C-alpha cells in the first residue's frame, strides 16, 4: 500500500512522474500518463493503492478521467478522493457528474457528504436546487454540509430557505452553522449584484436577531 514498506519508493517515483509531466505542460504526455493511471486503477484492489492513484489523477486528470472517477462516488472508502479529484478537474463534465450523483441520492450519508463538500469547493451553481431539497436533515453533520454548500453555491433563490433555518436555530452558533451559512450567502448574493435582496435579508436578519437577543 502507498506509504508502507517497499511500496513507498514506488509512490515517490510515481508522485515525481506526475509532477514532472505537469511541469512539462505537454498534453500528449499528460494524457498518456493519465490513461496509464486509469488502467492501473482498474487492475488494483487495495484501497490505499486506489486512493493514491486517484490522488495522482486529481493532479493531472481531465475529462478522460471523469467516467472512471464517477464510478467511485458511491464507495465509502473512495468517495472522498474521487469527489476531490472531480472538483479539481473542474470541467463541465466533472461538475455535471457530481450534481447528477447527488440528485440520485444513492450511496450512503458519508458518500453524499463527500460529494456535497466537492460541490461546495468548486462552487457549482447548478447544484442549488438539489441542495435546497436536502435541507432539514435530522443528521446534523449532513445539514451542516448542505448549509455550507448552499452558502457557497446559492443565489437569492436560497435566501428565504437559509433565513428560515437560521431563525429555527435562534440566530446563535450551533453545530450546523446555520446562522454563519446564512450570513455567508447574504454576502455572496451581494457580490452577485443582487443588492436589494441582500440588503433586505441583512436588515431582516439584524432585526430578528436583535429581537432574539443575539446581537
Question: Which role fits each region the language model picked out?
Answer:
Residues 5-12, 45-52, 65, 77-81, ...:
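Positions within the helices of HEAT/ARM-like alpha-solenoid repeats
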Residues 9, 53, 152-159:
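Short, charged, low-hydrophobicity "junction" segments
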Residues 1, 23-42, 60-74, 79, ...:
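Amphipathic alpha-helical scaffolding segments comprising HEAT/armadillo-like alpha-solenoid repeats
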Residues 11, 176-179, 199:
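Start-of-helix signal in alpha-solenoid helical-repeat scaffolds, especially tetratricopeptide repeats
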Residues 2-56:
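Mid-chain, structured segments of secreted extracytoplasmic proteins
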Residues 14-22, 58, 74, 87, ...:
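Structural signature of alpha-helical solenoid repeat scaffolds
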Amino acid at each position: 500500500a502507498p506509504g508502507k514498506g517497499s511500496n513507498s519508493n514506488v509512490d515517490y517515483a510515481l508522485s515525481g512522474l506526475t509532477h514532472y509531466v505537469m511541469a512539462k505542460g505537454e498534453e500528449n504526455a499528460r494524457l498518456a500518463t493519465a490513461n496509464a493511471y486509469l488502467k492501473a486503477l482498474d487492475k488494483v484492489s487495495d484501497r490505499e493503492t486506489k486512493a493514491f492513484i486517484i490522488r495522482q489523477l486529481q493532479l493531472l486528470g481531465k475529462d478522460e478521467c471523469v467516467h472512471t472517477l464517477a464510478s467511485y462516488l458511491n464507495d465509502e472508502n473512495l468517495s472522498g478522493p474521487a469527489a476531490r479529484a472531480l472538483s479539481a478537474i473542474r470541467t463541465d463534465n466533472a461538475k455535471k457528474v457530481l450534481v447528477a450523483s447527488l440528485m440520485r441520492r444513492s450511496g450512503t450519508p458519508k458518500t453524499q457528504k463527500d460529494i456535497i463538500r466537492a460541490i461546495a469547493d468548486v462552487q457549482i451553481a447548478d447544484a442549488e436546487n438539489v441542495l435546497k431539497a436536502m435541507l432539514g436533515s435530522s443528521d446534523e453533520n449532513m445539514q451542516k454540509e448542505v448549509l455550507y454548500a448552499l452558502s457557497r453555491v446559492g443565489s437569492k433563490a436560497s435566501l428565504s430557505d437559509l433565513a428560515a433555518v437560521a431563525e429555527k436555530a435562534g440566530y446563535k452558533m450551533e453545530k450546523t452553522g446555520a446562522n454563519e451559512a446564512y450570513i455567508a450567502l447574504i454576502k455572496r448574493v451581494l457580490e452577485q449584484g443582487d443588492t436589494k435582496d441582500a440588503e433586505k435579508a441583512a436588515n431582516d436578519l439584524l432585526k430578528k436577531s436583535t429581537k432574539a437577543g443575539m446581537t
